[in-house]
Amino acid sequence: MASSQCCDNPPALNPTGGEGKVVDSFGGLKAYLAGSNDAKAAVILISDVFGFEAPNLRKIADKVALSGYFVVVPDFLHGDPYVPENAEKPLPVWMKSHPPKMGFQEAKQVIAALKEKGMSSIGAAGMVVVELAKTQEIQAVVALHPGPVTVEDIKEVKCPISILGAEIDQMSPPELVKQFEQVLSANSEVAHFVKIFPGVAHGWSVRYNHDDAAAVKSAKEALEDTINWFNKNLK
């Protein structure tokens, strides 16, 4: 079930933001692309409810690209991000039009397009990554302040997974994240890295307050951990 935390500190969307470019179709979806076409490894960044035009998300894409990756930020919301001010579409109603299962299926289309480009290894970060991690389609994932994920989901993970949790999180509280770690530690076949960031809330890595030095520092640390995980498992 969606938590109000998933909507805190909404971004001011910018369709022209970022150092990369927007294309009308990548794997059948409009997408923001960053990085070199000559890269051999790719990363898919999957947005939260506010979509692929979020400025911080595109900044993250640009920084991941600087580490040698071809980065895709698909518009899984099809031009319909959640708008808190729209009283006609409260979050539960909006979610019915954008079920995570749909994003999972469309992510597989993006993975197929990356393979057609010759990418030898593919990682993903953001929403639905745990579902992707249950398949053989992807080589590494990073779950940032994960949403509705269960212990049973984690038991099905087949690829290296990093879980970066928040101390203040109603959707995946620290107690649950620690259970995830216990499950992963018992599975010697799946590499894992689990970390709980103190003093931050769900969504902090992409919807932090730029005027909050501690929040900015934590978001930077989460990005460094994300890139390090991909460097370790995709290159």
Please annotate each region the language model reported.
Residues D211-K235:
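Catalytic active-site module of serine/aspartate enzymes centered on a nucleophile-bearing elbow/loop
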Residues Q170-Q179:
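Conserved alpha/beta-hydrolase "acid-adjacent" motif
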Residues A107-K158:
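Primarily recognizes the serine-hydrolase "nucleophile elbow" in alpha/beta-hydrolase
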Residues L184-Y208:
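Catalytic histidine neighborhood in serine/cysteine hydrolases
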Residues V142-H145, L164, F197-P198:
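Alpha/beta-hydrolase-fold catalytic nucleophile elbow
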Residues V71-V72, I161, H192:
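Hydrophobic beta-strand scaffold residues
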Residues S4-K117, W204-N209:
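Serine-hydrolase catalytic machinery in alpha/beta-hydrolase-like enzymes
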Residues V157, I163-G165:
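Short beta-strand/loop motif that positions the catalytic acidic residue
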